Every structure is written in structure tokens, then in C-alpha cells.
């Protein structure tokens, strides 16, 4: 009986470790991908940069994209 309980605990520990490793190894988001729901998932050379959307002075939403660190984007007319 003790052997069955011990085996079950060992299997549970192994499955837990596998799940933790899978979470740590998730793929990062490449440049220009939307990161609104996952701001920490951009690749290491990128940052999740967010912009508010406005219509007639009222905020209607927010967009976030993985962009290069240190780069400033300006609107062109």
C-alpha cells in the first residue's frame, strides 16, 4: 500500500515539473504582434508598447504591439 502511495506522489511530482517547464518555455511574440492580453510575452529584444484609441476625444480602446526597445514611432500625415 505504501508503495502505491509513493508511486502516485512521484508521478504527481513529475507531471507538475513538466507543466512548469512547458510554461517557462512558451514561445515569445515576434515584432509587430499584438500583445494586449500578454504584455510579458514579447521576445527579449522587444517591448510591449500600448497606445490608446480615441474618437472625438473619447477613449474607445487600447492596442498593444511588440516593438523594438528604444525606438520612437511618430505619426506621419
Curated annotation (Swiss-Prot):
Domain of life: Eukaryota
GO MF annotations in UniProt: toxin activity
PTM comment: Contains 4 disulfide bonds.
Cellular compartments per GO CC: extracellular region
InterPro entries: Spider_toxin_CSTX_knottin
Similarity comment: Belongs to the neurotoxin 19 (CSTX) family. 08 (U8-Lctx) subfamily.
Protein name (record): U8-lycotoxin-Ls1f
Amino acid at each position: 500500500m505504501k508503495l502505491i502511495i509513493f508511486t502516485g506522489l512521484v508521478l504527481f511530482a513529475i507531471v507538475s515539473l513538466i507543466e512548469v517547464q512547458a510554461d517557462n518555455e512558451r514561445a515569445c511574440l515576434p515584432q509587430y504582434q499584438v500583445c494586449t492580453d500578454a504584455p510579458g510575452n514579447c521576445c527579449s529584444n522587444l517591448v510591449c508598447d500600448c497606445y490608446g484609441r480615441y474618437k472625438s476625444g473619447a477613449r474607445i480602446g487600447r492596442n498593444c504591439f511588440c516593438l523594438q526597445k528604444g525606438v520612437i514611432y511618430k505619426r506621419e500625415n
